[in-house]
Amino acid sequence: MALRVVRSVRALLCTLRAVPSPAAPCPPRPWQLGVGAVRTLRTGPALLSVRKFTEKHEWVTTENGIGTVGISNFAQEALGDVVYCSLPEVGTKLNKQDEFGALESVKAASELYSPLSGEVTEINEALAENPGLVNKSCYEDGWLIKMTLSNPSELDELMSEEAYEKYIKSIEE
């Protein structure tokens, strides 16, 4: 019993980091780095995926040569409640700036333009039954199409998120 009490008191002191003697160090905690430990930063395609924007308010993220395309928050707010999405068929080949579909809302209709050249590999089927996803989650569940990129260097011509925010401010003035 006395040993159990000593262990309990020691555990409490270790928790508080008030160990009475250096001869009895606290056991290492699994989440702490030991002496001489090295921490590494891992980078991978998911971490390096950056959202890029066009002047027509489409965005694209890329991973392993596949681009996911949607519209920006600014665009969905300007449109209002989206009630219909017209999207291309899988296999459609697009050049940069080609019109590939349209969004209709209670306020307006807006054409969609491809931010990059490539071939449509997937469309967001959920938008057929729930086009409002574009409003609710324009950067996640409200994406429009996925496409293979035929010219990945075109990404360099698109705006970063920071540059896009400056662009939005300039057109709102």
From Swiss-Prot:
<keyword id="KW-0496">Mitochondrion</keyword>
<dbReference type="InterPro" id="IPR017453">
    <property type="entry name" value="GCV_H_sub"/>
</dbReference>
<feature type="transit peptide" description="Mitochondrion">
    <location>
        <begin position="1"/>
        <end position="48"/>
    </location>
</feature>
<dbReference type="InterPro" id="IPR011053">
    <property type="entry name" value="Single_hybrid_motif"/>
</dbReference>
<dbReference type="GO" id="GO:0005739">
    <property type="term" value="C:mitochondrion"/>
</dbReference>
<dbReference type="GO" id="GO:0005759">
    <property type="term" value="C:mitochondrial matrix"/>
</dbReference>
<protein>
    <recommendedName>
        <fullName>Glycine cleavage system H protein, mitochondrial</fullName>
    </recommendedName>
</protein>
<feature type="modified residue" description="N6-lipoyllysine">
    <location>
        <position position="107"/>
    </location>
</feature>
<dbReference type="InterPro" id="IPR000089">
    <property type="entry name" value="Biotin_lipoyl"/>
</dbReference>
<dbReference type="Pfam" id="PF01597">
    <property type="entry name" value="GCV_H"/>
</dbReference>
<feature type="domain" description="Lipoyl-binding">
    <location>
        <begin position="66"/>
        <end position="148"/>
    </location>
</feature>
<dbReference type="GO" id="GO:0005960">
    <property type="term" value="C:glycine cleavage complex"/>
</dbReference>
<comment type="similarity">
    <text>Belongs to the GcvH family.</text>
</comment>
<dbReference type="InterPro" id="IPR003016">
    <property type="entry name" value="2-oxoA_DH_lipoyl-BS"/>
</dbReference>
<keyword id="KW-0809">Transit peptide</keyword>
<keyword id="KW-0450">Lipoyl</keyword>
<comment type="subunit">
    <text>Interacts with GLDC. The glycine cleavage system is composed of four proteins: P (GLDC), T (GCST), L (DLD) and H (GCSH).</text>
</comment>
<dbReference type="InterPro" id="IPR002930">
    <property type="entry name" value="GCV_H"/>
</dbReference>
<keyword id="KW-0523">Neurodegeneration</keyword>
<keyword id="KW-0225">Disease variant</keyword>
<dbReference type="InterPro" id="IPR033753">
    <property type="entry name" value="GCV_H/Fam206"/>
</dbReference>
<comment type="function">
    <text>The glycine cleavage system catalyzes the degradation of glycine. The H protein (GCSH) shuttles the methylamine group of glycine from the P protein (GLDC) to the T protein (GCST). Has a pivotal role in the lipoylation of enzymes involved in cellular energetics such as the mitochondrial dihydrolipoyllysine-residue acetyltransferase component of pyruvate dehydrogenase complex (DLAT), and the mitochondrial dihydrolipoyllysine-residue succinyltransferase component of 2-oxoglutarate dehydrogenase complex (DLST).</text>
</comment>
<dbReference type="GO" id="GO:0019464">
    <property type="term" value="P:glycine decarboxylation via glycine cleavage system"/>
</dbReference>
